[in-house]
Amino acid sequence: MKITWLGHSGFRIAIEQAVLLVDPWLTGNPLFPADRREEALAGATHILITHGHGDHTGDTVAIAKERGLPVVGIYDLVTWLQEKEGIDGIGFNKGGTVTLGGARVTMVQATHSSSMSGEAGPIYTGTESGYMIAGEGHVIYLSGDTDIMADMGWMGEYHRPDVGILSAGGHFTMDMKRAAFAARRYFDFRTVIPCHYRTFPLLEQSAEALKEGLPGVEVIEPQVLVPIEI
C-alpha cells in the first residue's frame, strides 16, 4: 500500500487494485508542482471526495472528464455533479460501504461544513464525511475536514484503523494538539499522517505538536509526491 501526498488534503492511495485520488485540488494549490500533474494522476481508478469545498473538490470534474474516472462521495454532492457536469459517479452515505478495486470504503461521520460556490450563493452538497478504507491487511481512517467528536469513539472501536490521515492544520479543522488528543483517546494508530496544513500562513506549518502528543506512534510528515509505503 502506498500513500502519496498531493499537498493540502489531497492524496493518491494505491491499495489493492485501486488507485484513489482523494480531494484532488491541484490547480492553484501552493504546495503542488503543476509540472508533475501526470505523475499524480497516472493509473488512477477513482476520485474520492470528502465534501464540497473548493480546496477539496478542486480538479475533480476536470480529472473525471479527462480520465473517465468515477467520482465517489456523499450522494447529494455526487448526484449534483453528475447532473451538472455529466460525469460518472458513485454516491452513497454515512454507514454505507462500496468496494473500489478490491478496497472496501466505508463513509463515516465528520464535523465541519460543506457547500460549493454558485452564482447565487452557496450550493448545498450534502454533509461532510470521512472514510475508513480497508485493504491489504490495513484500515486507513481518512478524517476529512473535522474537529474532535465523540463519534470517533465507536468509529475507532468498530473499524480499528491502524493508519490515520488526519486534518490537523487548525483554523478550519482541529489543530495538531487536538488531533493528537483525538488519536490518543479514540484510536490505536500505528501510523499517523497529518494533512490540511502548511498550505497557507494561517495553517500550522509543522507537525511537531502532533509528534509530541503521540509517543510510540509513527508520525510521518508527508512530502509532496513522495510515496509512503505502509
UniProtKB/Swiss-Prot annotation:
Single GO term (MF): hydrolase activity
The keyword Hydrolase is annotated on this UniProt entry: yes
InterPro entries assigned to the protein according to its UniProt record, in alphabetical order: Metallo-B-lactamas, RibonucZ/Hydroxyglut_hydro, UPF0173, UPF0173_UPF0282_UlaG_hydrolase
Alphabetical keyword list: Hydrolase
Keyword Chaperone tagged: no
SMART domains attached to this UniProt entry: Lactamase_B
UniProt record similarity statement: Belongs to the UPF0173 family.
Protein's recorded name: UPF0173 metal-dependent hydrolase Rsph17029_0942
Organism of this sequence: Cereibacter sphaeroides (strain ATCC 17029 / ATH 2.4.9)
